[in-house]
């Protein structure tokens, strides 16, 4: 089983990506895009791993087990730079640092690979710094950019990149993959539905009962708000559980990555790490610290998006549209809530939540935003 098998994509799209990653001379710049739940970020990372995979047969690249793949996935490969930001915008200094790294020749792999997420946060003044490097990179450098959609990226940048637009997997396809991985059919369908087609989230829900219970109950907090104090309590509980969920996800992944890296380097757990290898371990630790903060903000954003599914279910019941509910497990509670509010009120809540989600993506004060939103449900 290779890394490519993780991705739930149309067969033609997946085959094309595999061929492109193993080509003698791949395109120098790529733009991976997809809506929330689409695997564009994971696909870009797997593409990077395949570019630096050590398998001699091009058809086998992206194996997921060689040193090249493992160190790309955990961020410790010396020829791979994985840039993500918590800031509202990507700074000129960030861009200049990436441009400098792009000039370095590969030290162990075939390519110097720069994976730049959050490209939609790049203002025009920053894009001007990157433009030349992306348009005419050194022959050994490949740029991989990610964003929610092509239109989120300045035209001067996206016009220089080969586009890879990936769809959100169908819920049935995500469920089928979970079943193939040994998950019971009903649980697989339930997890895939709650995850809204996000395969990574669905897998966690299917294998972690505590995470599944949090997902089933957390978005329903809004239905029990009766006072300002209960609104604050709901906001605090949502934030606390999102932080806990993120910490658990990061811890499990961090330990797995450290174990894999030590095995690749030939180091037994607890043994002294030689100075020549310590830099790779430190690089992994630094990457994990940066990623932990991002996981926390992404988890909180996802928690608020899950509340959005509750509001849409309520609106579905109020309008009697007959559409399937995303939170079918809570139909009775949703019906009771729908009966004591109006469709107009629910629509106002949906619109307010869209504003909150937009501001959360710009690193605004999450607690203030969520407390304000919860306060809307006070009767």
Where are these regions (language model features)?
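Charged, glycine-rich active-site and insertion segments that engage polyanionic ligands
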Residues: 1-50, 68-71, 139-141, 148-306, ...
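Conserved catalytic/switch belt of AAA+ P-loop NTPases
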Residues: 103, 128-145
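Catalytic acidic motif of RecA-like/P-loop NTPases
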Residues: 117-123, 128-135, 151
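P-loop/Walker A NTP-binding region and its immediately flanking N-terminal helices
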Residues: 1-119, 124-125, 142
